[in-house]
Design a protein with these regions (language model features):
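N-terminal module-boundary/linker segments of secreted carbohydrate-active enzymes
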Residues: 22-78, 85, 90, 280, ...
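Aromatic-lined carbohydrate-recognition surfaces of secreted/lumenal glycan-active proteins
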Residues: 43-44, 165-171, 189-216, 257-268, ...
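Substrate-binding cleft of secreted/luminal carbohydrate-active enzymes
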Residues: 35-46, 263-324
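Bacterial Sec-dependent N-terminal signal peptides
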Residues: 1-22
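Acidic-and-aromatic substrate-binding clefts and catalytic sites of carbohydrate-active enzymes
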Residues: 47-58, 80-91, 140-144, 211-216, ...
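Glycoside hydrolase catalytic-domain groove-lining segments
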Residues: 109, 220-270, 312-315
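Substrate-binding cleft of extracellular glycoside hydrolase catalytic domains
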Residues: 84-202
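Alpha-helical scaffolding within the catalytic cores
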Residues: 25-27, 54-65, 90-94, 148-151, ...
């Protein structure tokens, strides 16, 4: 009986230690150590459409990456798509939980539906969201926030910290949230942040990123008190990060983590590219970045349809699931 109790105590201790490594502080402090020869390998698991949040499903990009390389990324991100709504909240939540349980650093994107009633790229009038009193646009967006807050609470109750991006590319005027410019884009980000924080959702590492447009990071920056991770998209052959020096200053002066929030290493019309170009660019131009997250949607963005993917993921400078 005593031996059984000892074994149980050890198992509980090990379980607790595992959870302690998944707290917000533990994960964020770890991310701060990256860069300069050690870079996080991330991958979008799902974007929108019908990419299944279960990492073992054939449509999930974590499965596709592993099938191609035999290696799992360290960071994986699932999108809660409220525009098309192809899955239930329970399916998205369970997808994030499976990532967490398998040892991934879990990310969550939101793709909020247009609160004015149109599609994701339809015109909007957003000021009513911030007005006193009730109105239909405000009610719609608050309903969506309540829905997502309930999901975040479920994740918190299950001991899961996530890197959360409330608005994908905050400056992207193809999307409804940016159609009225930086003023309301910033207000939306701050609103979600404050609303979730007041609900006690302290399992969130707050991520902000923009398109690769020059100057977008400064123009749309919500503020130091609202952002933990600053990111930039980079698509095509350039592998650019225009505001790198500004971002490095934020890293040094305000303790921010900086990375490529979205990365696609070539266009569809281009010939397959050597994946090691990413590592070369990091080492020679952007060594302060903590890493990157490859885009999904199609293999030409990531290691699946480019050259030396398995070798690239096995490189000791890249942090994958088994190399921490």
């Amino acid at each position: 009986m005593i031996n059984r109790l000892k074994i149980t105590a050890v198992l509980v201790l090990l379980f607790s230690l595992n959870l302690s490594g998944q707290t917000k502080k533990e994960i964020f402090d770890y991310l701060k150590t990256l860069g300069h020869g050690k870079y996080l390998f991330g991958q979008m698991a799902t974007w929108v459409h019908n990419e299944n949040p279960d990492m073992d499903d054939s449509t999930n990009w974590i499965r596709k990456i592993h099938d191609h390389t035999g290696i799992y990324p360290r960071y994986a991100c699932i999108t809660y798509d409220y525009d098309d709504d192809p899955f239930t909240d329970a399916q998205w939540n369970e997808g994030v939980k499976k990532l967490h349980d398998r040892g991934f650093i879990a990310g969550v994107y939101n793709f909020y539906a247009n609160p004015c009633g149109g599609r994701w790229n339809s015109p909007v009038t957003l000021d009513p969201i911030f007005e006193d009193g009730d109105n239909a646009i405000k009610a719609d967006f608050y309903k969506q926030m309540d829905r997502m807050a309930a999901n975040m609470q479920w994740l918190k109750d299950n001991g899961i910290t996530v890197i959360y991006t409330p608005f994908v590319e905050l400056d992207d005027k193809n999307k409804w949230h940016a159609k009225e410019g930086s003023r309301n884009g910033i207000r939306l980000y701050r609103l979600v942040h404050d609303y979730f924080t007041k609900k006690g959702l302290d399992n969130i590492i707050w991520a902000f990123h923009t398109t690769q447009r020059p100057g977008a990071l400064q123009e749309y920056y919500p503020g130091d008190e609202y952002v933990d991770i600053i990111g930039k998209s980079a698509y095509g052959s350039g592998l650019i990060f225009n505001e790198y020096e500004w971002a490095v200053e934020k890293k040094r002066s305000s303790g921010k983590v900086i990375w490529w929030g979205e990365l696609g290493i070539r266009d569809q019309k281009d010939e397959p590219r050597d994946c090691f170009d990413v590592l070369t660019k990091l080492e020679t131009s952007f060594p302060e970045l903590a890493g990157f997250s490859f885009w999904s949607d199609a293999g030409f963005y990531n290691v699946v349809d480019n050259l030396n993917g398995p070798k690239f993921m096995a490189d000791p400078k890249l942090v994958t699931l088994k190399k921490r």
